[in-house]
Structure formats: C-alpha cells, structure tokens
C-alpha cells in the first residue's frame, strides 16, 4: 500500500469516527510531530488544513513547505516564542502570564490562543491551575491583538479519559460564564478523541491514528 493510500484510509476512518459522535463542528488537527514534510504534503492533498506540532524547530521547517493553519501545542519556552509565533497561527498551551507578555512583544501577527488547564495540579506536565486560569484569561482577553479562543487540556497520566473530560467540561462551563466568547475546547488525541468530542471538544489533536505509530525513541 502506498503512503498516500495508507494515510487516506486512516484519515477517512478518523473523520468517520468524528462524524459519528459530533453534534457540533469539530476541527481536526493532524499532529505531524516526528513525521516528514512529505506526509504533511499528502495530508494537504487529502484536504487537511490544520497541522499541529509540539516542537518549534519541526513546525518552523514544515510550515515553510506546506502552508495552512499551524498549531503549536507543546510546552512553551520563552526563548522559543519569537520563532514559534513566526510560523504558528494558533497556540494551544499558554499557561503562564510571563509567556503572554513575551508573545505581546514578539508576535508578528495576531494569534488565536487556548489556555492549557491542569486537571491534576502536575504543573511539570504543563497547564495552569484552575485558580490561575481566570487571571490568565483576563490578561489575554484584554489584548487588542490576540484572540482568546478557550481552553485546552490533556488527561492526567493513568486516569480514565472519559472522567477527565467530564471534569474538563465542568471547568469549561464555569469558565464560559465569565468569558462567553472563549467557547472553544481543544481536547482529545488518537486514543480518546471521541470521548473528548462527546464532552464538548471543538478541536481534536490526532497524530498516530492518521500517520501511524512513532518509533519508541520519539
């Protein structure tokens, strides 16, 4: 089977599974980390317009080859933000006011921003605590340049994703009472995107279900 046929078959399967559970529009972000730009070109050929990267260097390189909506979803380092904001149009992982202050200074174009919320308080994995979330939201929503889209989260290691997304839905509903315009939810990966959608996810970040397994060292 050719690489085009393999990706096409996987992509159609994912799209069908999204359609089976979605009662609202869902943006499929194809996560291309560790995969070559040639795979991104195939995805574009198949109608994919949104691509996700966790690493600045990979995103910078591939975005030069394939135009589209590029999403950065990795943990943010301040010294990488000038580069990240040069190629990404969406950031899914803002969890620190200091990072937003840097974004305000270095971003060459308006960004769509999701705030990453931690569901278990393990901040080394990324994510602001619920108590910090509103302060961060006030900061971003007050920007005249950038757009606060909503929330992003990843289920804690070892937990039931369905329970995690149920918890996230409660946090989101409370958040939207304060910030009704920030109604987007970035949640769900290859193993659990249907559950995330059933709990309200508007953006799912799917890699291996479309492009195949990554090698263990990656």
Where are these regions (language model features)?
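Expand to "…catalyze enediolate/carbanion chemistry for C-C bond making/breaking, isomerization
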Residues: 197, 206, 210-217
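Conserved, well-ordered active-site substructure
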Residues: 203
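Conserved alpha/beta-domain cores
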Residues: 1-191, 197-199, 211
